[in-house]
Amino acid sequence: MTRSSLFEELAEIAKERIMIIDGAMGTMIQREYMEEEDFRGEILKDHDKPLKGNNDLLSITRPDIIYKIHKLYLEAGADFVETNTFSGTTIAQADYRCEHLVHEINYQSALVARRACDDVGAATGRRRYVCGAIGPTNRTLSISPSVEKPDFRNVTFQELVKAYGDQARSLIQGGVDVLLVETVFDSANAKAALFAIRTLFEDEGVPEMPVFLSGTIVDMSGRTLSGQTGEAFLVSTKQGKPMAVGLNCALGAKDMRQFVDNMSKWSDSFIICYPNAGLPNALGGYDETPEEMADVLREFARDGLVNIIGGCCGTTPDHINAMYKAVQGITPRVPPQDPHAGKMLLSGLEPSIVGPETNFVNIGERCNVAGSRRFCNLIKNENYDTAIDVARVQVDSGAQILDVNMDDGLLDGPYAMSKFLRLISSEPDVAKIPVCIDSSDFDVIIAGLESTQGKCVVNSISLKEGEEKFKERARIIKRYGAAVVVMAFDEQGQAAETDPKFEICERSYRILTEEVGFNPNDIIFDANILTIATGMEEHSNYGMYFIEAARMIRENLPGAHVSGGVSNISFSFRGMEAIREAMHSVFLFYAIKAGMDMGIVNAGALPVYEDIDKPLLQLLEDLLFNRDPEATEKLLVAAQEMKKDGKKADTKTDEWRSLTVEERLKFALVKGVDQFVVADTEEARQNTAKYPRPLNVIERPLMDGMAVVGELFGAGKMFLPQVIKSARVMKKAVAHLLPFMEIERQANIETMGLAEDESPYQGTVVIATVKGDVHDIGKNIVSVVLGCNNFKVVDLGVMTPCENIIKAAIEEKADFIGLSGLITPSLDEMVYVAKEMNRVGLNIPLLIGGATTSKTHTAVKISPRYPHPVVHCLDASKSVVVCSSLSDMSVRDAFLQDLNEDYEDVRQEHYASLKDRRFTDLNKTREKKFKIDWDKFTAVKPSFVGRREYQNFDLNELIPYIDWKPFFDVWQLRGKYPNRSYPKIFDDADVGAEAKKVFDDAQTWLKKLIDEKILVANAVVSFLPAASEGDDMHVYDPETGNKLDTFYGLRQQSGREHDQPHFCLSDFIKPLKNGVPDDYLGLFACTAGLGAEEYCKTLEKNHDDYASIMVKALADRLAEAYAEYLHKEVRTTLWGYSTNEDLTESDLLSIKYQGIRPACGYPSQPDHTEKRTLWKLLEAEKNGIGLTEHLAMLPAASVSGLYFANPQSEYFAVGKIDQDQVIDYAARKNVPKEEVERWLSPILGYDTD
């Protein structure tokens, strides 16, 4: 492969001065006012399609015009002109049926530009250069043109490679100096173009010439149309070896600056920047003047951001001339030496850096058909939606790279790999991280590489089939731009011992770096982690062999990385999860020290090395390093003596009572022991030599203890129930000190005339559940955790009007406001509070939390209404991080910058999704409704019609129906697979012990609540004749037959495959038969929360938050259990359509019964206003169950809904709906469209602002 001398020539000029590229070709063509015949010319005079607008044809039909435009730009000062070939591929020309002219278009365009450059160069004595313009085409590899089929693509990678190759070849034949791949909105398309160009250089003998690459950031999110950040775009395309990289189009110069700045820091190439002349005006024109644009780009130049500047849409020779003059004498940017030297760069939608300072990189392992039976079954059954959820869980659990393997004999591997990767590309929360394409079939690897826009890892290749095959595959991987995993495997087989492992890796490294030209930082060696303790002596050193091989690789093969499957080491102890997890921790401790920097491991299940019991640690290290031939047997014995979570049972002791008072207070706080805290606090207070003031006791020993609690919770070494118990201890101590502090305050007022204005807290947080919402368990937990972390919390309770929140914030001089809500109407109330905070002039941060909230809603709907920090807090620990970061002036600015950038990304992604989302027309969805053959259906008549009440129900009967998993979720105790559900959670290595403690507490409290009749459970059930009409369900008076009311339905409108029905609840109710209803609908409401609120207030007055949260959580579980019990009674007795049902409690919780009970305001009918009809028909208030103005149920521990008996009825989610359905729904309900939009805002598929 020969190399053009232009590299050195252009590099020298770009180091001396800022170079200029031309402006818009299309803008100048429009000024010529050409007609259809200009585009046809003689060659296309009889063409069967209109051609006006196909500007590339003008290089053939009107070359005089194109030459004139080139010359004007060159005379204005341009160093480079672009050929008139933006749409010069067979793919783009297919729209005009001009594919047959592609070679001529490109060849003639290059000749015209070449002649203009040569003519002006000769006249001015300054050489000019031709850039062969290669546009993005009108198709994209990363985005489906069909919303209904997100895996569909209307072009393949290889089709693009051929089209780009043909174009580049013709441009080169016409005499271009540079190939410019521009306006890249999808990095996958750019990768195809670069692949084609590298193929020309490396396989066809075309001399290598400079390549420029310019992406397009579509808006202020800083992302391309396909979702990548500018930095990720650079990483994805680095294999193309661009001499210059940068941005053009979409944005004006001012808006483009921050993104050019980022690229300038990231890239060691020259930086090119040619923005639009501002943003389009209402008429599609561009208003930024040459002087305005030149002034901005002059600042780019002065700040050392650019090497080449020019213009895109709306720019003219006058703009280029102004730029040329503006940068005269300014020293160009000096490209940095490789800013990421010694690091591996990968990318998904975002860049990922693996280097010396990077923590161990966790590779998610569950998207592997060979390693996960569940994932394999999902793929075989074409259940890709759920398979994507598996990937999402991996990312949410901390995977930094997603391993995907489709190697199964019953699968079409290339098809499955392509489909899965294409699907996850439309899931930003998954696609943000890089993919590891894992297969032993190279065709599957190629399919994967051609289905993702990021820089991937290929897993794997080896010397197993010899050097030639190894080099062939390595060169292909390199051309695609991926990193590679190399197995320690050669022609003789898999290496087990240290020296063979290293020898194979060293040989592979030499071939890759010296013969293939691989970047050593893109090489990952899997040095084979093999199982120890198998009973075979030759296996006993396998752990040491790997660790020593890792050390040798990192010390002797610069840049290379070491990876492996960690769980292999402990396979002989399968079934003993606590032992396995501890063994993984010990193995990684030493392997990472030796140089292993990435691997497949369940990081969430690793105990901290220092926390492993010393006797166990000794046994594990003896086993790992083969120091004791009986280590395996000893470990098996130890396992029998251990608790299932791998830790020795605690022994009770009162030795701590002999410690100093400070140590006793700390112990009480950390352990949650309140028995002696008042006495110990008083002892500390009386030591006035050490603590002159009561406040000093809070500031020092008590806060010191809570600091330990906060640290342990943040590190995952304490769990939420323990933290809440600690808070209870703290509150009791502070309550004891408050009267003494008040006496001191009054004394100060009398002697000094004023009270001291001081606080021991980090800050003050006013927190409330918003108006209309009664749910507060999550809010209460946040209050406790914030209090444990030295924040003063002013809790305003539930159903708090906006004016009360703002008033409290002003009176308390709050540093933060926190809003909580569970039901969707609360989202609108939060928007209103934000607006009011802005109106009254507050400038403190606003925290948003609760089950119905999301980062997207916060960023899109709330944040724009309040020009100060607005932060979505996912859970209690997140709120601490947010408040602490915003309180610490040393990190506040950086935190806010990251937050603002993140929320801007979220906003832009949201608006982009609205543009791209496609909906089925409402009438067509009704044609595709779920159809039941009503002629063959006979409804079962209930045992009674009308209304029936159930008062003061025996709670003991509900205990078997309790679903305990949500209970543990309240306490943020989440087991890891396979110990997620109850009772398996008790076996979880991390949370099992604490879950058992909380569960035992719950049993004690359940008994107390029932025995003392603290809680009361009531319910009301009704069965009414019913008939469907379209999407609605009418209910009738059982005596008169008159229509009583209507339940209105919403129908699925998006996300359905062509053969899938579009569900609506009315599909499960029979229409009128001969004008008479011939079916039934059930209605119910139940509660187990009567009495809970009053009792919890008493507990909170006694500073017992733990008990208060426990009571509310149990009331909630009992209410759900009551709903489950009632539904069983309905099925088997009250309605009696399933009299022979014989299901276990587990079957009930798994919904294995006939019929459904959807709730208003939830997925099958997301409209909360339907509760008004339900309440009117049930007269639920008579049973003590009410509705707030925002339609939350009161008490909070209440459940309501409808009963459907049809055997074909099933749960479904309506999902997003379009405006046509909203208009239709509003008309049917006879309410304003705006009111419907307010209540249905979370499911609207369009923006109402």
From Swiss-Prot:
Cited function: Catalyzes the transfer of a methyl group from methyl-cobalamin to homocysteine, yielding enzyme-bound cob(I)alamin and methionine. Subsequently, remethylates the cofactor using methyltetrahydrofolate.
SUPFAM superfamilies according to UniProt: Cobalamin (vitamin B12)-binding domain (SSF52242), Dihydropteroate synthetase-like (SSF51717), Homocysteine S-methyltransferase (SSF82282), Methionine synthase activation domain-like (SSF56507), Methionine synthase domain (SSF47644)
List of residues binding S-adenosyl-L-methionine: 963, 1157, 1211-1212
Gene: metr-1
UniProt miscellaneous comment: L-homocysteine is bound via the zinc atom.
Membrane spanning residue stretches: none
Binding site for Zn(2+): 249, 312-313
Occurrences of domain B12-binding (ranges): 762-897
Pfam families, sorted: B12-binding, B12-binding_2, Met_synt_B12, Pterin_bind, S-methyl_trans
Organism, scientific name: Caenorhabditis elegans
Metabolic or biological pathway: Amino-acid biosynthesis; L-methionine biosynthesis via de novo pathway; L-methionine from L-homocysteine (MetH route): step 1/1
Cofactor remark: Binds 1 zinc ion per subunit.
Catalyzed reactions per annotation: (6S)-5-methyl-5,6,7,8-tetrahydrofolate + L-homocysteine = (6S)-5,6,7,8-tetrahydrofolate + L-methionine
Domain AdoMet activation: 913-1249
InterPro entries (alphabetical): Cbl-bd_cap (IPR003759), Cobalamin-bd (IPR006158), Cobalamin-bd_sf (IPR036724), Dihydropteroate_synth-like_sf (IPR011005), HCY_dom (IPR003726), HCY_dom_sf (IPR036589), Met_Synthase/Corrinoid (IPR050554), Met_synthase_B12-bd (IPR033706)
Residue span, Pterin-binding domain: 360-621
UniProt domain B12-binding N-terminal: residue ranges: 652-749
UniProt-listed Gene3D superfamilies: Cobalamin-binding domain, Cobalamin-dependent Methionine Synthase, domain 2, Dihydropteroate synthase-like, Homocysteine-binding-like domain, Methionine synthase domain, Vitamin B12-dependent methionine synthase, activation domain
UniProt name for this protein: Probable methionine synthase
UniProt domain Hcy-binding: residue ranges: 1-327
